A protein has these predicted regions:
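The Walker A (P-loop) glycine that initiates the GxxxxGKT/S ATP-binding motif of P-loop NTPases
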Residues: 221, 285, 307
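P-loop NTPase nucleotide-binding/switch module
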Residues: 170-209, 213, 240-295
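Peripheral, non-AAA+ core regions of ATP-driven protein-machinery
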Residues: 1-218, 222-225, 331, 471-472, ...
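Walker B catalytic acidic pair
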Residues: 300, 306-307, 318
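Walker A/P-loop
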Residues: 219-260, 325
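Basic, amphipathic alpha-helical bundle interface domains used for macromolecular binding and assembly
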Residues: 33-44, 59, 66-76, 290, ...
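Short beta-strand elements
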Residues: 18-24, 283, 387-390
Length: 519
């Protein structure tokens, strides 16, 4: 008897409907076609055990299985459930008239318990697009899948629950998630606040500008100056995620299996802080079965690289293209996977190997050669891609003890949102551009053209600091953001002046100045 059930194969963020065909006739052979990987083929043993524990027998017959389309590689254990239901139906052990109305995904434990799978949300989106009545998933995946409207989602504990649902022996209610209510309730809840930061007003201003324009930023200062503390509070002043951004971000985390149990939608911008020992593959994504890396998990959020020079130099260099393109393409011999990675890159580093250059409370013990080797770990092209570069000095104890609580994140966030609203209106006719940091060169000339006084100031800065052409464009982008924060339609000389101040770590000035002083 030939039976068909339906499942899905996830390739990056793309999902393909898979028809699971099972034909059982007298005989003793077991065959599987359709490019299933090891996890798919091993499903036979899991299915046999799950059926036996729940009172069914794995058929002793000639079983032929095909996973169509046969030329598409199928990976993972999510095919256990559709295979088990197809085998039960083809053998006559169960009868269901609605089997073809549902898409099924789930890994089976040996006792028949359904284990969570990766990619439940994009699978649910595909199921709705294919006009399936419903989707059956493991209980742990039900809330992320139930985000999709106009699709019945059933979260099941074990295979017996699935059998009872599909045979009509019991009636189950589909899972319902009030997506909008949960999304907006959690959107503005932050555990960290800029009010906790005493002093460092100039750095907080730089972070405000970065948040307002979506700019990358690096902070350089001695240990204990507050670099990590401020970076971790950046999400609290960023504009809230839109529902479409939240859905896109949640899909990436779903495919990576990073969603917390019970989570329906990610309602706050991600903050990822990988350790400096991270590999290239873990950072940008890849592997035998390509998975999203940290840069994609930070999509629509923040990627924080603490102690930047401690990262492997080659690992840092692979960031250059994603920072420009806002996507990462992973190529294999027979297919290509693309993950989005539009994130704010925030980095911190010490000013020298010992960490105490320019610290009034500690003496720097580094030689010029040590400083040069330390600085060479960060290439000029990578530094050029960081719009805002600022130095931090420690806050003296007397200032920490006397200072009033800093400005709360909510107040800063209001200004950031107003600036972003200006940018949204400005770029409404430009596809893929939402903030100043994403402006193309032509758009810079259109929206951030400096006046004569600003051009003279820029010329002086370019010559004095040996700035690159890319740095010139970065200055204009940042100046446009500062003007938006001021509510100014034009980029004026004071905006250019502040933006130039955020390029004080460029190679032509900062590294050489340190070597001269160290001597």
């Amino acid at each position: 008897m030939l039976v068909k059930t339906y499942s899905a194969a996830v390739n990056g963020l793309d999902v393909t409907t898979v028809t699971v065909e099972v034909n059982i006739v007298p005989g003793v052979m077991y065959r599987m076609t359709g490019l299933g990987d090891t996890a798919v083929r091993e499903g036979r043993d899991r299915i046999a055990s799950a059926l036996q524990v729940n009172g069914y027998k794995f058929p002793h017959a000639d079983i032929t299985i095909n996973l169509a389309p046969a030329d598409l590689r199928k990976e993972g254990s999510s095919f256990d459930l559709p295979l088990a239901m197809a085998i039960l139906t083809a053998s006559g052990a169960v009868t269901s008239d609605v089997l073809a109305d549902y898409m099924l995904v789930g890994e089976l434990s040996l006792d028949g318990t359904l284990q969570p799978v990766k990619g439940a949300l994009p699978i649910a989106i595909r199921a709705r697009a294919e006009k399936f009545k419903g989707l059956i998933v493991p209980k742990q995946n039900e809330r992320e899948a139930a985000v999709v409207n106009n699709l019945e989602v059933y979260g099941m504990e074990n295979i017996m629950d699935v059998i009872k649902l599909l045979t009509g022996r019991e009636v189950y209610e589909p899972t319902f998630v009030d997506t909008r209510r949960e999304f907006y309730e959690q959107q503005s809840r932050f555990d960290l606040d800029f009010a906790d930061v005493r002093g460092q007003e100039s750095v907080k201003r730089a972070l405000e500008v970065a948040a307002a324009g979506g700019h990358n930023l690096i902070m350089v200062g001695p240990p204990g100056s507050g670099k990590s503390m401020m970076a971790k509070r950046l999400p609290s002043i960023l504009p809230p995620l839109s529902l479409s951004e939240s859905l896109e971000t949640t899909q990436i985390h779903s495919v990576a299996g990073k969603l917390k149990r019970g989570t329906s939608l990610i309602s706050q911008r991600p903050f990822r802080s990988p350790h400096h020992t991270i590999s290239e593959v873990a950072l940008v994504g890849g592997g035998i079965n390509p998975q999203p890396g940290e840069i994609s998990l930070a999509h629509n959020g923040v990627l924080f690289a603490d102690e930047l020079p401690e990262f492997n130099k080659q690992t840092l260099e692979v960031l250059r293209q994603p920072l420009e393109d806002h996507k990462i393409t992973i190529s294999r011999s027979k297919y290509t996977v693309e993950f989005p990675c539009s994130f704010m890159f925030i980095a911190s580093m010490n000013p020298c190997p010992c960490g105490y250059y320019n610290d009034p409370t500690h003496k720097c013990c580094c030689t010029p050669g040590q400083i040069q080797r330390y600085m060479s770990k960060i290439s000029g092209p990578l530094l050029d891609r960081i719009d805002i570069q600022c130095e931090i000095t420690p806050v003296p104890f007397k200032d920490i003890s006397k200072a009033q609580p800093g400005e709360p994140s909510a107040a800063i966030r209001e200004r950031v949102i107003k600036a972003r609203d200006i940018q949204t209106a400005r770029y409404k006719d430009f596809k893929g551009v939402h903030c100043n940091a994403q402006m193309t060169e032509r758009m810079i000339h259109q929206f951030a053209e400096p006046d004569e006084a600003s051009i003279a100031l820029l010329r002086t800065a370019m010559e004095k600091f040996s700035l690159s052409a890319r740095a010139y464009n970065r200055i204009l982008k940042v100046a446009r953001t500062i003007a938006d924060l001021d509510g100014s339609q034009r980029v004026e000389v004071q905006h250019i002046s502040e933006a130039i101040g955020y390029r004080n770590l460029d190679r032509g000035d900062w590294a050489e100045r340190r070597l001269v002083i160290a001597k």
